[in-house]
């Protein structure tokens, strides 16, 4: 077949005229200089092709073979003519990756299939048997590779990519018109390559050559990108099946297909066929970015499905008690007094103050301690007053440090009662008060400040109070927290008696006293309520 009319092509944005017939004639003459190639089986098995003519580095001529399905081209043109598109055409695009230029040939008419004389007589170029369009599954796409003996023209082949296997895609491939080799056409030696290519390129449909003047009907024939992603997810076991998608989701996932987007996916499919050793850094970054965007889209899709299909769970809400003091204080006079004391407090905090105060009463303690063997109401209580008090300043500071270590051990140990914890904090604050009495101060110095400084340096030697960034150190904050807690428990013991530290049941956590009764006013109100109800 010959084309007599010249066609236009562009190089670097400039339109030039080219006699396509002369160009194809030159290809025929060029192809005639090549000896018949060996069979596919011999080339893949490596039994032939060892001569000088098959050496890719030799000075012999190189042949560019364009493999395409003529039936697919004719079927595409016939479908376009039936749709009323009388100007259906076929485009051939030659791209030079080295010079970063491309030549596009727009062929007005394609009358009948034709082959060159040399390619028709070559057994290696015999067409493969292809299944019908209805016989394949969209998720089982296989991309075949050319033989290792075939090579590209010198002027379009990069030096670093001589041994790269390039994919061959059928032109005008659509979801209803893809062509792949049958099982009997696949040689055993290349079966692993086809399986690897099938897994790597399942997301990229075979787009082939698309005319720059593609119509909207051509765009509608292209597969949906997100539908292809769902197929890959199902095959990898990481997503839902395509049947699980509702029609509304499929319509929502559709996007306007353009020529530029199809060409971009075609280039990505060709780059994905390259081996990691010969792939350029730019191509690797493109593939990584594409995979990251696909993973992000799939994760968002899975999150949306999980939110929509998540079963309803019962949320456990905290128990809210009614802050009614009448249920706790039956005596009217006591109730009026408690109302006056807690008028400025939160009602829920006032209710808990009264509830914990009633829990300390002797009858409540006797009932609560009946099941506890380690808390004896009438037993002796080891307190600082029963021990020999230190006299010197060094002894006091040493006792203070030992008490802090003891508190840390009690907090980490699995003890059954909080009695020892409370007693240790009272002893800690007693050491602190005794050191304030005997410390020697200079003019303008405060006993409280000097006592804290000496205790801190003894407890944490070499650790400054302020960090290099101007903030207080963790050790200084922990030291002040110990002093503050010791003051709270010492105040309770001094107002209500030392026995209160043992009579407090386990239902009253030490964290409630230390965290809820933060201010001095709140602590004294609770102490007065305990004294009133006792």
Swiss-Prot record:
Uses: Hypothemycin is an antifungal agent that exhibits excellent activity against Peronophythora litchii, which could be helpful for the storage of harvest litchi fruit. Hypothemycin is a strong inhibitor of a subset of MAP kinases such as human ERK2. It can therefore be used as an anti-cancer drug thanks to its inhibitory activity of Ras-mediated cellular signals. It can also inhibit Trypanosoma brucei kinase TbCLK1 which is a good candidate as a therapeutic target for African trypanosomiasis. Finally, hypothemycin also has inhibitor activity of T cell activation.
Pathway as given in its UniProt record: Secondary metabolite biosynthesis
Record field: compositional bias (Low complexity): 112-127, 258-275
Residue span of region Disordered: 34-61, 110-130, 236-287
Record-annotated membrane-spanning stretches: none
Primary role: Part of the gene cluster that mediates the biosynthesis of hypothemycin, a resorcylic acid lactone (RAL) that irreversibly inhibits a subset of protein kinases with a conserved cysteine in the ATP binding site such as human ERK2. The first step is performed by both PKSs hmp3 and hmp8 and leads to the production of 7',8'-dehydrozearalenol (DHZ). The highly reducing PKS hpm8 synthesizes the reduced hexaketide (7S,11S,2E,8E)-7,11-dihydroxy-dodeca-2,8-dienoate, which is transferred downstream to the non-reducing PKS hpm3.
The protein's name: Hypothemycin biosynthesis cluster protein hpm4
Phylogenetic lineage: Eukaryota, Fungi, Dikarya, Ascomycota, Pezizomycotina
């Amino acid at each position: 077949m010959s084309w007599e009319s010249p066609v236009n092509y562009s190089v670097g944005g400039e339109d030039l005229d080219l006699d396509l017939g002369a160009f194809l004639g030159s290809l025929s003459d060029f192809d005639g200089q090549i000896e018949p190639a060996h069979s596919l089986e011999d080339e893949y098995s490596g039994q032939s092709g060892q001569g000088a003519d098959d050496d890719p580095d030799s000075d012999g001529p190189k042949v560019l073979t364009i493999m395409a399905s003529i039936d697919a081209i004719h079927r595409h043109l016939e479908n376009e003519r039936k749709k009323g598109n009388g100007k259906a055409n076929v485009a051939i695009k030659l791209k030079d990756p080295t010079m970063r230029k491309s030549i596009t040939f727009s062929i007005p008419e394609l009358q009948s299939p034709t082959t060159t004389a040399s390619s028709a007589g070559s057994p290696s170029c015999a067409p493969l048997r292809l299944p019908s369009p209805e016989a394949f599954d969209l998720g089982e796409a296989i991309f075949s590779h050319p033989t290792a003996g075939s090579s590209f023209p010198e002027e379009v082949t990069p030096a670093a990519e001589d041994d790269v296997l390039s994919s061959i895609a059928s032109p005008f491939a659509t979801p209803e018109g893809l062509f792949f080799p049958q099982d009997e056409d696949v040689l055993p030696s290349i079966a692993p390559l086809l399986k690897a290519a099938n897994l790597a390129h399942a997301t990229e449909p075979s787009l082939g050559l698309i005319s720059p003047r593609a119509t909207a009907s051509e765009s509608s024939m292209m597969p949906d990108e997100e539908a292809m992603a769902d197929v890959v997810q199902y095959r990898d076991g990481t997503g839902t099946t395509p049947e699980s998608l509702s029609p509304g989701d499929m319509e929502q996932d559709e996007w306007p297909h353009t020529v530029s987007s199809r060409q971009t996916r075609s280039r990505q499919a060709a780059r994905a066929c390259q081996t990691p050793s010969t792939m350029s850094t730019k191509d690797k970054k493109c593939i990584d970015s594409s995979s990251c965007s696909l993973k992000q889209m799939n994760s968002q899709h899975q999150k949306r499905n999980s939110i929509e299909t998540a079963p309803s769970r019962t949320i456990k809400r905290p128990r809210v008690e009614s802050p009614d003091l009448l249920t706790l204080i039956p005596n009217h006079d006591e109730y009026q007094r408690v109302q006056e004391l807690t008028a400025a407090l939160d009602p829920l905090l006032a209710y808990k103050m009264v509830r914990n105060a009633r829990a300390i009463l002797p009858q409540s303690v006797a009932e609560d301690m009946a099941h506890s063997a380690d808390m004896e109401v009438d037993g002796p209580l080891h307190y600082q007053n029963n021990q020999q008090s230190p006299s010197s300043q060094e002894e006091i500071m040493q006792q203070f440090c030992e008490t802090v270590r003891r508190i840390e051990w009690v907090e980490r140990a699995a003890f059954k009662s909080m009695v020892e914890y409370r007693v240790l904090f009272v002893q800690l604050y007693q050491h602190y008060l005794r050191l304030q009495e005997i410390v020697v101060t200079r003019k303008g110095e405060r006993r409280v400040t000097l006592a804290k400084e000496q205790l801190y340096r003894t407890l944490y030697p070499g650790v400054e109070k302020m960090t290099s960034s101007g903030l207080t150190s963790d050790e200084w904050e922990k030291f002040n927290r110990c002093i503050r807690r010791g003051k709270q428990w010492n105040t309770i013991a001094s107002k209500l008696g030392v026995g209160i530290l043992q009579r407090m049941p386990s239902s009253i956590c030490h964290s409630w006293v230390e965290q809820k009764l933060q201010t001095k006013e709140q602590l004294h109100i609770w102490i007065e309520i305990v004294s009133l109800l006792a």
